[in-house]
C-alpha cells in the first residue's frame, strides 16, 4: 500500500507539471496570435503592444515554473 501512495504522488506531480506546460503553451500561442493581429491592425502601436506582450508572456510562463516547483516539492518532500 505504501508503494501505491508513492506512485500516486509521482503521477499527480507529473500530471500537474504536464498540464501546466500544455496550458502555458496554448496561452502563449493565443497571446502571440493576438499580438500579431493587433500589430497588423495598428502598426503605430507596435512598441506599446510589444511591451505588454512580453509582460503578459512572462506572467503566463511563470505558471509552469510554479507548477514545476510544486511538483518537485511533492515528489521529494511530501513523498518521504
UniProtKB/Swiss-Prot annotation:
Subcellular localization: Cell inner membrane
Listed SUPFAM superfamilies: F1F0 ATP synthase subunit C
Pfam family, one: ATP-synt_C
One cellular-component annotation, GO: proton-transporting two-sector ATPase complex, proton-transporting domain
Primary subcellular site in the record, as a coarse category: membrane
Site (Reversibly protonated during proton transport): 61
UniProt keyword list: ATP synthesis, Cell inner membrane, Cell membrane, CF(0), Hydrogen ion transport, Ion transport, Lipid-binding, Membrane, Transmembrane, Transmembrane helix, Transport
Membrane topology label: Multi-pass membrane protein
Gene3D superfamilies reported for this sequence: F1F0 ATP synthase subunit C (1.20.20.10)
Record field: transmembrane: 11-31, 53-73
Assigned protein family: Belongs to the ATPase C chain family.
Subunit structure as annotated in this protein's UniProt entry: F-type ATPases have 2 components, F(1) - the catalytic core - and F(0) - the membrane proton channel. F(1) has five subunits: alpha(3), beta(3), gamma(1), delta(1), epsilon(1). F(0) has three main subunits: a(1), b(2) and c(10-14). The alpha and beta chains form an alternating ring which encloses part of the gamma chain. F(1) is attached to F(0) by a central stalk formed by the gamma and epsilon chains, while a peripheral stalk is formed by the delta and b chains.
Cited function: F(1)F(0) ATP synthase produces ATP from ADP in the presence of a proton or sodium gradient. F-type ATPases consist of two structural domains, F(1) containing the extramembraneous catalytic core and F(0) containing the membrane proton channel, linked together by a central stalk and a peripheral stalk. During catalysis, ATP synthesis in the catalytic domain of F(1) is coupled via a rotary mechanism of the central stalk subunits to proton translocation. Key component of the F(0) channel; it plays a direct role in translocation across the membrane. A homomeric c-ring of between 10-14 subunits forms the central stalk rotor element with the F(1) delta and epsilon subunits.
UniProt name for this protein: ATP synthase subunit c
Amino acid at each position: 500500500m505504501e508503494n501505491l501512495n508513492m506512485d500516486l504522488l509521482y503521477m499527480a506531480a507529473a500530471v500537474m507539471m504536464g498540464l501546466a506546460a500544455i496550458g502555458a503553451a496554448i496561452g502563449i500561442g493565443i497571446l502571440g496570435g493576438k499580438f500579431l493581429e493587433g500589430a497588423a491592425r495598428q502598426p503605430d502601436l507596435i512598441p506599446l503592444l510589444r511591451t505588454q506582450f512580453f509582460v503578459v508572456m512572462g506572467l503566463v510562463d511563470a505558471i509552469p515554473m510554479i507548477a514545476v516547483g510544486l511538483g518537485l516539492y511533492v515528489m521529494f518532500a511530501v513523498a518521504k
